[in-house]
Amino acid sequence: MHSVICLFGAFIAAALFAPGSCLPTVIGLYGETIEVPCNNGNNKPDGLIFTKWKYAKDDGSPGDLLIKQAQKDDPTVSAMDGYKTRVSIAANSSLLIAQGSLTDQRVFTCMVVSSTNLEEFSVEVKVHKKPSAPVIKNKVKELENGKLTQLGECVVESANPAADLIWMKNNQALVDDGKTIIITSDVTKDPVTGLSSTSSRLQYTARKEDVASQFTCVAKHVTGPNQVSTPDTFQIRYPTEKVSLQVVSQSPIREGDDVTLKCQADGNPPPTSFNFNIKGKKVTVTDKDVYTLTGVTRADSGVYKCSLLDNDVMESTQIVTVSFLDASLTPTGKVLKKLGENLVVSLEKNASSEVKVTWTKDNRKLDKLPDFSQLRYSDAGLYVCDVSIEGIKHSFSFELTVEGGPRITGLTKHRSNDGKHKVLTCEAEGSPKPEVQWSVNGTDDETSYVNGKATYKLTVVPSKNLTVSCLVTNKLGFDTKDISVFSLFEEDKPKPGKNEDGADQAKVIVGVVVGLFLAAALVGLIYWLYIKKTRQGSWKTGEKETGTSEESKKLEENNHKADV
C-alpha cells in the first residue's frame, strides 16, 4: 500500500518530489529562512493536542526541535544543538529555519497529535546557493595562428549544487574536439561550508579571423538565470601575406588638393614602416603608414606603389588621377546686337574626363543653344553655360540684347463687351520697347511687351466717323498706321444692336450687288451692239437672217434690257 501511495504522489506532485524519493521536497536558499510545511497546511484536526517538529540527524537518529501545545501561543524549543536559536513555528504550523545552510539538507518530520489520532508528515529539505559571477583568469597575452594554446581558466565559486561552465566564442558554444579545442573542468568543495567551486580551462587553436573574436564563459545553475563573464579578445600573431595601398583623400582629386596614400599589411602585429614608390622614386617612412602629396597638379597623375621594408616583392599599386577642367566662353558679359545680325558663340574646353555642358536662358533649361545666324527679338535674354566634370564646375554667362526700329504689325478695332465703346489694338515690334502715341484721346486699357512684341490698347467713344493713327517710336526710328473708326451713334440708328463690323459687311454686300448689276448691263450693251452690227451686215448683202423663233425672241429681250 505504501508503494502505491508513493507512485500516486509522484504523478500529482512531481514538481515537489525529489528524483527517486517518495518524500515531498522543499528548496531553500542559502543564508535565508527556510519554510518547511506541515502537511501543506492541513494540520488542525478536531481535538488537536499538540504539534511537534523533529529531524533526522546525520547518524539517522531522530532529534527533537520544538513542540507547540494547541492551548498555548508560544512553542517550546527542545533542540540543544545548532537549531536551538534558528527554529520557530509559523501560524500554519510550518517549521521556520533561519539562516539556511547546507547542514539543513535533511528530512524534517511534523507530528500532529489529537485526541483520536497521531499523524506524521516528513519533508526533505534541499538548500541551493547561486554561484559567484564567472571570471576568466590566467589569460594568455597572445595567441599564435594555428597553434594550440591555453587561452585561460574560468572560475565560479560558492555554489550548491555545483555550477556548469560553458566556453563561448562570439556567443557560440565551443565543443571539445580533442584537437583544436580542449576543455578541462574541475569541481572542489569548501571543507567548512560545503559549497562547490567549478573551474574550466580552455586550450584553443586560433585563426587569423579570431582577431576580433570575443570569448566568454557562461555559468549555468539551477537557481538561474545564466551568468556570463566579461568578454575578452586576444591578440593573434601571424605573418603578413598581403599589402594594400589606399588613396584616402576625397574623390575626385582636384588640382590643389592634398592626397594621402595609406599602406596596410594583413600581418599581426601590423608593420609600422613602409617603402612608398612615388612615380619611380622610393621614399621610406618609419613608424607610420601614410605618405602625403601636397598641392597636387595634373602632372602628379600616375602610378604609385608601397611595399614592406624587408620585402619589395610584396607590394600594392594604385593609379592616382588628378581631375582638371579648363574652359572659356566667347562672348561673355553684356552683348548688344541689331535685329537680323549674326552672333557667334564659342566654347573652348579641356578636361581630364568627359565634359558635361548645359545651357539655360533666363533660368530655363535649353536642349541646345539656339541658332543665332539671324537674331530675333525673342533671342534676347540671359544665357548661362555650366561646364562640369565630376567634382569640378565652371559657369559662364552673357546677356544678349537685340535692338531694332519699331514696326507696326497690326491695327484692329472692335466694340467693347458692353457695346458703349470702341477698343483699338495696335501691335508693334521693336527694341528698346516702343512708345505709342494715338491721334485721338481715349483710355489706355493695357500694355504688354514680351520678346520685342508690344501690344497697346485704347478705348474711345467716337461721336463721329474718325481716322485714328497709331504712332510707335524708339531711339532707332518710328512707324505709323491709320484705321477708320465709325461713330457709335450713326451705327445705332439704322441697325440698333449691330456692331461696326456688321455695318461694314452690309456696305460690302451692297457694293457687290451694284457691281453685279453694272456688269450685267455692260454685257447686255455689248451683246446688243454685236447683234446690231450683224443685222446691218445682212442688209448690206441682202441675205435673209436665219435662226429659230426662240433665238429671235431672246435677242429682242436682250436688246430691250440693253436699252433700259
Curated annotation (Swiss-Prot):
Residues 239-323, 340-399, 406-484 form the Ig-like C2-type domain. The CD6 binding site is located in the N-terminal Ig-like domain. One of its GO terms (molecular function) is identical protein binding. InterPro entries: CD80_C2-set, Ig-like_dom, Ig-like_dom_sf, Ig-like_fold, Ig/MHC_CS, Ig_sub, Ig_sub2, Ig_V-set. It is a single-pass type I membrane protein. It comes from the Eukaryota. Its main location: membrane. Residues 539-564 are annotated as: Disordered. The chain crosses the membrane at residues 508-528. Homodimer. Interacts (via extracellular domain) with CD6 (via extracellular domain). Homodimerization and interaction with CD6 involve the same region and cannot occur simultaneously. The affinity for CD6 is much higher than the affinity for self-association. Cell adhesion molecule that mediates both heterotypic cell-cell contacts via its interaction with CD6, as well as homotypic cell-cell contacts. Promotes T-cell activation and proliferation via its interactions with CD6. Contributes to the formation and maturation of the immunological synapse via its interactions with CD6. Mediates homotypic interactions with cells that express ALCAM. Mediates attachment of dendritic cells onto endothelial cells via homotypic interaction. Inhibits endothelial cell migration and promotes endothelial tube formation via homotypic interactions. Residues 25-127, 131-229 form the Ig-like V-type domain. The gene is alcama. Expressed during axonogenesis in a subset of developing sensory and motor neurons that fasciculate with each other in the central nervous system. Expressed in the retinotectal system of both embryos and adults, with expression in all retinal ganglion cells (RGC) during embryogenesis but only some RGCs in adults (at protein level). Residues 541-564 have a biased composition (Basic and acidic residues). Residues 529-564 are cytoplasmic. GO terms for biological process: adaptive immune response; axonogenesis; cartilage morphogenesis; cell adhesion; embryonic viscerocranium morphogenesis; heart looping; neural crest cell differentiation; neuron differentiation. Keywords: Adaptive immunity, Cell adhesion, Cell membrane, Cell projection, Developmental protein, Disulfide bond, Glycoprotein, Immunity, Immunoglobulin domain, Membrane, Repeat, Signal, Transmembrane, Transmembrane helix. This is CD166 antigen homolog A. Residues 1-24 form the signal peptide. Disulfide bonds join 38-110, 154-217, 263-306, 426-470. Residues 25-507 are extracellular. It is found in: Cell membrane; Cell projection, Axon; Cell projection, Dendrite. Glycans are attached at residues 92, 350, 441, 465. It holds the Pfam family C2-set_2.
